């Protein structure tokens, strides 16, 4: 069986804080991909509740470097930026920098939003 790793970065939505069944979207995604293919998928959940894009940027290099076997990064961040009135240009710059770090590590990047 082939082993695939996906790195999921984000805030409480990624972490799964509001799921009444204690499941996160990374766990469910890994399960669904494994069931639909002949390959095993593991999604590393690096979601932290309350985190902004600035917080995520500060830890991105270590998170991305430590998951060098992952070739896909899913990024969902921004809810807390909105709630904390972080200017849009700062949010956009943070996303660009996070994505650039992933590109340095030869990752495909998927940016999600709500």
Regions found by a protein language model. Name each.
Residues 1-49, 54, 59-69:
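Serine-esterase "nucleophile elbow" of acetyl-processing enzymes
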Residues 31, 39, 55-114:
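Alpha-helical cap/lid subdomain in secreted, periplasmic
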């Amino acid at each position: 069986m082939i082993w695939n790793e996906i790195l999921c970065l984000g805030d409480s939505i990624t972490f799964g804080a509001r799921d009444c069944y204690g499941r996160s979207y990374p766990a469910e995604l890994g399960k669904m991909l494994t069931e639909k293919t002949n390959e095993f998928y593991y999604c590393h959940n690096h979601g932290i509740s309350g985190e902004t894009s600035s917080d995520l940027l500060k830890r991105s290099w270590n998170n991305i470097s430590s998951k060098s076997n992952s070739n896909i990064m899913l990024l969902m961040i921004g809810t807390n930026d909105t709630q904390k009135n972080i200017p849009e240009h700062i949010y956009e710059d943070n996303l660009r920098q996070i994505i650039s770090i992933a590109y340095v590590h030869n990752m495909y990047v998927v940016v999600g939003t709500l």
